[in-house]
A protein has these predicted regions:
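Phosphate/nucleotide-binding beta-alpha loop and adjacent structural elements of enzyme active sites
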Residues: 1-184
């Protein structure tokens, strides 16, 4: 038995899941699944949630946050500060809208790519509306330009416990090169 749901007109749907209101773009598979099933990478999320609480983590860095599903879901952990990084302006704009509507004070957003240098880079996406872009999939005709910087240039922390979620489409090595100081 398969269930099908079709959306017409306004692709953005608002839905409250576990006390957080999300604005989901049903043209995109992850958003659609989260809208219908109310979960996304639950196994990984539950591990992150448990480890953050168990280790009294001070900062959660959501590198490649997209529209912030991890940041939003973890925002209820007391005393946790969240830094969400994404190079795609539409993703950050949507995340900021959800931060505002949910009155969240512990999430700070950064509209930048992270790597081993400072400058500008071109990201390629399969569709114009997709939240996922890549530096390396140049066969896609849709693109956007973003600034790029080292994590070490953007935030400073001493003797704090960090939890990093890094999902940046094969650019992880370059991210790590730009995060040497913060990871010491």
């Amino acid at each position: 038995f398969k269930r099908y749901i079709f959306f017409t007109g306004n692709y953005f749907k608002s839905k409250n899941i576990s006390g957080i209101t999300y604005f989901l773009d049903t043209r995109y598979l992850i958003d659609r699944n989260f809208y219908l099933r109310e979960n996304y990478e639950d196994y990984l999320y539950s591990i992150a949630n448990k480890l953050i609480i168990l280790n009294k983590v001070n900062f959660f860095l959501d590198i490649g946050s997209c529209w912030g599903i991890y940041s939003l879901r973890l925002s209820g952990i007391k005393k946790l500060r969240i830094f969400s990084f994404d190079p795609i302006l539409d993703n950050i704009t949507r995340l900021k809208k959800m931060i505002k509507i949910n009155n969240l004070k512990n999430i700070q957003t950064f509209n930048t790519a992270l790597g081993s240098k400072k400058g500008k880079v071109k990201f390629y996406g399969l569709e114009k509306f997709t939240p996922n872009y890549s530096l390396y999939d140049k066969r896609h005709k849709n693109f956007t330009v973003s600034k790029i910087d080292k994590l070490d240039n953007l935030i400073k922390m001493n003797k704090k416990v960090l939890y990093l979620k890094v999902d940046i489409e094969r650019h992880e090595y370059h991210f790590l090169l730009g995060a040497k100081n913060i990871l010491k």
